Amino acid sequence: MFSVVAQTEGTFSIARLKYDGGGDWYNDPSAEVNLLNFVQQNTNIKVDARYQFVEISSEEIFSYPFLFMTGHGNVVFSEDEVERLRLYLENGGFLYIDDDYGLDNAVRREMKKVFPANKFQELPFSYGLYSVFYNFENGPPKTHEHDNNPPRGFGIFIKERLAVYYTYESNPSDGWADAAVHNDSPGKREEALKFGTNIIVWALSQ
């Protein structure tokens, strides 16, 4: 079982994953804060909505049941980080990765180091995450238009549990950020926040 040290008084929090390689792991720090506030307002989940980040090499990684990773550029995990992230995920931790455009090749390369024999699988629209709280019958929303490719969602499973969820060409976390950051419409932002709520509810329900 995953030991949630930091979830005092039953509160749920998210930690942004800090990684090496040059990618902007830190972009849009308002994203998680806004998502967690939305979750608290629309579900019975009690949250700690502070912005928090953690390095893979830190013992603090095991204090968070949910890690969030995003960015535009390169990602590099050291051998020690690969082992620690694998241990975290195998012991019940959950990682959500949102490609903010330009992250795909690096994410796939580095996650293959973590799970060499466990590849990303594209999730069908019938998968439970897409209807666990709000209904997304066509899968991930297209929040931020980078090009004309369809939004897609991928997963890595450990003993039938979704341990890693990865959105590509979707970018819902842009819709979580403060409205002035990306100028997404109110409708797009609400859709993105609802989708993020589904991810959290699904991660907690497994």
Regions found by a protein language model. Name each.
Residues 1-3:
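Bacterial N-terminal signal peptides
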Residues 6-66, 70-73, 171-172, 178-206:
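Aromatic-Pro/Gly-enriched surface loop or interdomain linker
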Residues 10-12, 62-66, 90-94, 118, ...:
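Loop/turn elements at helix/coil->beta-strand transitions in domains of secreted/extracellular proteins
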Residues 14, 66-105:
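Short alpha-beta junction capping motif
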Residues 21-22, 30-31, 104-180, 188-197:
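An acidic, glycine-rich "communication" segment
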Residues 45-55, 97-100, 118-126:
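Surface-exposed patches in mature extracellular/periplasmic domains of secreted proteins
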Residues 49-56, 78-84, 148-152:
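Alpha-helical scaffolding within the catalytic cores
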